[in-house]
């Protein structure tokens, strides 16, 4: 889990727009966040496999 202080810092509006960055809405992870879902790759996989994300299916070919 991410530190609460860092999550609060990311939620506040930065002085300059370039400093803004995305965090996972579920766990607060700063890396590999999918903008479309607002989730990191780990949370996205967990929720997709549990069937909590409508329209997302496991790929097979």
Curated annotation (Swiss-Prot):
Keywords, ordered alphabetically: Metal-binding, Ribonucleoprotein, Ribosomal protein, RNA-binding, rRNA-binding, Zinc
Q: Does the keyword S-adenosyl-L-methionine apply?
A: no
One biological-process term from Gene Ontology? translation
Its GO CC terms are:
cytoplasm; small ribosomal subunit
Q: Which cofactor does it need?
A: Zn(2+)
The record's cofactor note says: Binds 1 zinc ion per subunit.
Claim: Zinc is one of the keywords in the record: yes
Which Pfam families does the record associate with it?
Ribosomal_S14
Q: Name one GO molecular function term.
A: zinc ion binding
Provide the binding site for Zn(2+).
Answer: 24, 27, 40, 43
**Listed InterPro entries:** Ribosomal_uS14, Ribosomal_uS14_bact, Ribosomal_uS14_CS, Ribosomal_uS14_sf
Under the subunit heading, UniProt states: Part of the 30S ribosomal subunit. Contacts proteins S3 and S10.
Question: Its function?
Answer: Binds 16S rRNA, required for the assembly of 30S particles and may also be responsible for determining the conformation of the 16S rRNA at the A site.
**Similarity annotation:** Belongs to the universal ribosomal protein uS14 family. Zinc-binding uS14 subfamily.
State what protein this is by name: Small ribosomal subunit protein uS14
